[in-house]
């Protein structure tokens, strides 16, 4: 939702506050990898109960995730593989964070936490999959209630401020709602395309 509203305006803010990133070309794929290593390590921090540290790692990795695209666009070095790599490694971070929390709650013998984080993990994977699968057929899938940026931001802030439980419930409900939104959108759009295709066949037959 936030990404849809702000769009590339984020690039301007990054240029303003971090001009040194644009002094000379940097391979954006390296920034993507660096961000993944940093944010992915949050999973280990979550597993060890260092939730504040995990939140800081997620925010730092998220910064790299914003910067890689801005750098690529600024120097005109965006590639299809870069976009693919960025999207794929985002999933790695998502899964690592939730697995870290599942491990933490399992060690603490809190089955409710394990179930809640498992639900978030499954819904997060479905959120990504429904969008990728639907966009093979329809032109564009709207983001929905909670996109990745909102999910990571909420999890990071909740971890740093030590309000993890309410944030996890927000993530669980919001992510499931997002999955349902995307499925309903795909249902409507694919139904429309099917109707148009049938109409064309009828016209051709006549």
Model-derived segments and their meaning:
Residues 23, 31, 40, 63-64, ...:
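Structured catalytic core of nucleotide-sugar glycosyltransferases
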Residues 16, 20, 36-39:
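Residue-level detector of alpha-helical secondary structure
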Residues 23-25, 47-48, 77-78, 137, ...:
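Helix-loop interface residues and adjacent transmembrane-helix termini in multi-pass membrane transporters
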Residues 20, 24, 70-74, 133:
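Membrane-interface helix caps of multi-pass small-molecule transporters
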Residues 2-19, 88-206:
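A feature for the membrane-embedded catalytic helix bundles of lipid/isoprenoid biosynthetic enzymes
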């Amino acid at each position: 939702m936030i990404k849809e509203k702000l769009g590339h305006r984020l690039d301007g803010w990054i240029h303003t506050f971090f001009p040194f990133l644009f002094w000379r070309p940097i391979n954006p794929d390296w920034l993507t990898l660096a961000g993944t290593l940093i944010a992915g390590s949050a999973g280990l921090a979550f597993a060890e109960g260092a939730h504040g540290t995990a939140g800081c790692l997620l925010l730092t990795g998220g910064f790299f995730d914003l910067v890689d695209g801005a750098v690529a666009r600024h120097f005109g070095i965006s590639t299809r593989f870069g976009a693919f790599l960025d999207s794929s490694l985002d999933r790695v971070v998502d899964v690592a964070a939730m697995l870290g929390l599942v491990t933490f709650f399992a060690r603490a013998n809190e089955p409710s936490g394990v179930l809640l984080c498992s639900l978030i993990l499954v819904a997060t994977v479905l959120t990504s999959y429904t969008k990728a699968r639907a966009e093979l057929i329809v032109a564009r899938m709207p983001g929905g209630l909670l996109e990745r940026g909102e999910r990571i931001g909420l999890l990071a802030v909740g971890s740093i401020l030590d309000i993890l439980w309410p944030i996890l419930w927000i993530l669980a409900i919001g992510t499931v709602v997002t999955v349902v939104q995307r499925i309903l959108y795909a249902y409507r759009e694919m139904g429309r395309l099917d109707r148009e295709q049938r109409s064309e066949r009828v016209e051709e037959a006549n």
